């Protein structure tokens, strides 16, 4: 039976390659224990897994049930008050809200780990996992890192998210793509699945048929071509150039890859190394079979130079004529020169520089790396450099950090989790609930996690050389070991810390030292770009980077480190909250920063009053952030046309049942799109309530708030939990992400604010 282990309990004493800055605080690993669990517990797990499979085409998002089953067993709670139901013709009472909050808080307390954070599914893009599996297979480490139990769960996950036509999307909710289908099919085959010996032979047959019917693997985007070439089922002559020499260009040139958004930069870095080394797995039976199964014509007859230019039209951003010309020149003329003497000498210099950067990234993230794609690629590079190196062994010890198990199977997370982010938001929600008897223990433990996760080290060496900004004082998305400060994570953590400082030290402990808060302000201010926005990772990149190196060909390319209302709003809120408590510290700089950020938010507002989301779905999420950012800057509803228009937008989207529910297709449609059947979603309803409550909606017309509160009260389950209703997170604007804690956090937050604003209850002991 699978069990989630956290913190130091995740460390195998026989593994000497793991390192940590704070004794693995926040680390979370799913481990298989054949002796664990009673027969009844195993039966319950199997029933949940079977239930998901039976309903997988109707409900594609897992509910993180396995975590809940384990933690509810380990962290027993007091008997819950009876569930509340408010009929359509009845008004919401204070007791209704208080009881619902108490039930929600008691349930949520069971999900908190011993070290103070909240764990949860943070998966999304399905193409992350194939890259890691291919990397492990090529290095010969697949079976040593992933046990048969891991591989069985990975296969179950992939099969569960296959669409009825045989394809796979880029994420569980997405329509079928050649990229997703080819990589998922290859992953299953590498794990021993075949049409002759698998219980899922029909699923494999349908997948292969879909691939062939859609042009075969020659039509996958460049990223897919790259991974297939590494595996040895595609030729490098069919891959667009990824010249490592570009890293030797003067940094002042716009074509320097150091100007790429952070995530793309740290993916292009190892890709260019592997491209230059032409890594390709040797021919095996499975490689030979895949060469036959993935293409519409015999492998030896494929025109690879022609294939290099191919790509499914619906899956890529079309390249411009200029881009095509540059890539052709690089492929036909520059690459032959760099592959032979004397150009080879320059290539060797570039490769040495790249490995310096890779080792720096590995060492400053404890071999976790900024994302799972760069993790797999960096691991390959270390293996290529020295197959017996300590660096490669340290990489292998960190693979399991990215894997998460739910009732739909084992998947790869967007990061090594979202522990800090979820915990910071949870603190703010718990404080808003104003029920200290229910919250004080949770808050005390969460505070310790947040404090101990703050980055307390500066990046070693010259920041400009390593393409970094200052790190000391920032907060990461997940764990301190991950090491990357993120603007909105830092801002939300600071707001949580400042909110905790207003609570009784008897309840939550001593406040964070001023010096560390000041260090956080240094980091936050460094994120601001010249246009007033705050980037997620790096403020130094221009708005127009070197598009020629957009190796993903993804339509979400620009959103990864460019204009973002959510990050900008979070930082403005944090700076404003800090300024109220510490009005003398860098006051002028903070004032100017807030003004510039506010102007950016106002410029970004859409004509209908909304804002477009980047990290959540979509207009609902971003409009809440837009409003909160403007309010933090000092704007008020009756004085701000922007806030008035935003509130009008939100109210115009309220459903007849009183809730809100937005489909992730809003990203693609570029217009607000309701969920099918005009269903309400508790998280979207909560975001809308929080936005309206912050602007004083209760004083203008409280009826929309009462109707929304009924949705949140009536949607609560017998356990105090809320059901999984659909995806809520996003990345790049075109890939969905799961945030399993949101369905608990935001109803608590919204009902807490509703209770305070409508019934005037604050800091109650009950």
UniProtKB/Swiss-Prot annotation:
Its EC number is 5.4.99.66. One of its GO terms (cellular component) is lipid droplet. It comes from Lycopodium clavatum. It comes from the Eukaryota. NCBIfam families: squalene_cyclas. It catalyses: pre-alpha-onocerin = alpha-onocerin. The active site is at residue 488. The record marks 421, 615 as: Transition state stabilizer. PANTHER family: LANOSTEROL SYNTHASE, TERPENE CYCLASE/MUTASE FAMILY MEMBER. GO terms for molecular function: intramolecular transferase activity. Pathway: Secondary metabolite biosynthesis; terpenoid biosynthesis. InterPro entries: SQ_cyclase_C, SQ_cyclase_N, Squalene_cyclase, Terpene_synthase_CS, Terpenoid_cyclase/PrenylTrfase. This is Alpha-onocerin synthase LCD. The gene is LCD.
């Amino acid at each position: 039976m699978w069990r989630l282990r956290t913190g130091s309990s995740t460390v195998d004493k026989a593994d000497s390659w793991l390192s940590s800055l704070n004794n693995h605080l926040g680390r979370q690993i799913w481990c298989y224990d054949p002796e664990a669990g009673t027969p009844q517990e195993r039966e319950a797990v199997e029933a949940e897994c079977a239930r998901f499979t039976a309903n997988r085409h109707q409900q594609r998002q897992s509910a993180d049930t396995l975590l809940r089953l384990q933690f509810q067993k380990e962290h027993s709670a007091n008997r819950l008050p009876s569930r509340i139901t408010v009929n359509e013709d009845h008004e919401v009472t204070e007791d209704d809200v208080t009881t619902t909050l108490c039930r929600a808080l008691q349930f949520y307390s069971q999900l908190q780990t011993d070290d103070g954070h909240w764990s949860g599914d943070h998966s999304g893009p399905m193409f992350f996992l194939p890259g890691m599996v291919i990397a492990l297979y090529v290095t010969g480490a697949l079976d040593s890192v992933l046990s048969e139990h891991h591989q069985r769960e990975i296969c179950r996950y992939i099969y569960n998210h296959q669409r009825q036509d045989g394809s796979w999307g880029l994420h569980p909710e997405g329509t079928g793509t050649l990229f997703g289908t080819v990589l998922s099919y290859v992953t299953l085959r590498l794990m021993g699945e075949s049409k002759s010996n698998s219980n899922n032979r029909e699923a494999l047959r349908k997948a292969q048929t879909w691939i062939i019917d859609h042009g075969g693997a020659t039509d996958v985007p460049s990223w897919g071509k790259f991974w297939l070439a590494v595996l040895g089922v595609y030729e490098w002559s069919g891959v667009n150039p990824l010249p490592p020499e570009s890293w030797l260009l003067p940094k002042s040139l716009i074509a320097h890859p150091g100007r790429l958004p952070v995530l793309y930069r740290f993916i292009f870095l190892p890709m260019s190394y592997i491209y230059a080394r032409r890594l390709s797995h040797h021919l095996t039976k499975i490689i030979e079979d895949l060469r036959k199964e993935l293409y519409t014509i015999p492998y030896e007859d494929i025109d690879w130079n022609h294939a290099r230019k191919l790509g499914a039209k619906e899956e890529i951003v079309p390249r411009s004529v200029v881009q095509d010309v540059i890539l052709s020149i690089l492929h036909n003329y520059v690459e032959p020169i760099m592959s032979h003497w004397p150009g080879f000498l320059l290539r060797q210099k570039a490769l040495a520089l790249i490995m310096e950067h890779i080792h720096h990234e590995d060492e400053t993230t404890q071999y976790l790396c900024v994302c799972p794609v760069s993790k797999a690629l960096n691991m390959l590079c270390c293996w290529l450099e020295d197959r017996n190196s300590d660096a490669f062994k340290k990489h292998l010890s960190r693979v399991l950090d990215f894997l998460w198990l739910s009732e739909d199977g084992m998947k790869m997370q967007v990061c090594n989790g979202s522990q800090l982010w979820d915990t910071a938001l949870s603190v703010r929600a718990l404080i808003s609930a104003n029920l200290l008897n229910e919250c004080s223990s949770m808050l005390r433990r969460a505070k310790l996690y947040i404090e101990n996760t703050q980055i307390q080290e500066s990046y070693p060496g010259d920041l400009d050389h390593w393409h970094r900004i200052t790190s000391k004082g920032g907060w990461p998305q997940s764990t301190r070991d991950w090491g990357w400060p993120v603007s909105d994570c830092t801002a939300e953590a600071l707001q949580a810390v400042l909110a905790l400082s207003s609570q009784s030290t008897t309840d939550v402990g001593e406040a964070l030292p001023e010096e560390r808060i000041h260090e956080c302000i240094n980091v936050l201010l460094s994120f601001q770009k010249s246009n007033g926005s705050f980037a997620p990772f790096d403020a130094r990149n221009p708005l127009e980077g070197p598009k020629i190196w957009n190796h993903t060909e993804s339509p979400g390319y620009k959103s990864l480190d460019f204009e973002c209302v959510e990050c900008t709003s979070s930082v403005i809120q944090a700076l404003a909250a800090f300024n109220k408590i510490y009005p003398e510290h860098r006051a002028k700089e903070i004032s100017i920063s807030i003004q510039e950020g506010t102007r950016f938010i106002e410029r970004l507002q859409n004509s209908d009053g909304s804002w477009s989301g980047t990290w959540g779905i979509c207009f609902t999420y971003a409009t809440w952030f837009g409003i909160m950012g403007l309010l933090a800057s000092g704007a008020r509803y009756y004085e701000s046309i922007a806030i008035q228009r935003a509130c009008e937008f939100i109210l115009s989207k309220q459903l007849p049942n009183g809730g809100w529910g937005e489909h992730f297709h809003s990203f693609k449609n570029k217009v607000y799109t309701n969920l099918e059947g005009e269903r309400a979603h508790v998280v979207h309803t909560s975001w809308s309530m929080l936005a309206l409550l912050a602007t004083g909606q209760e004083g203008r017309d409280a009826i929309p708030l009462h109707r929304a509160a009924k949705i949140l009260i009536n949607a609560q389950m017998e356990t105090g939990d809320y059901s999984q209703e659909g995806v809520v997170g996003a990345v790049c604007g075109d890939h969905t992400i799961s945030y399993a804690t949101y369905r608990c956090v935001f109803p608590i937050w919204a009902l807490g604010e509703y209770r305070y604003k409508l019934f005037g209850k604050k800091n109650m002991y009950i």
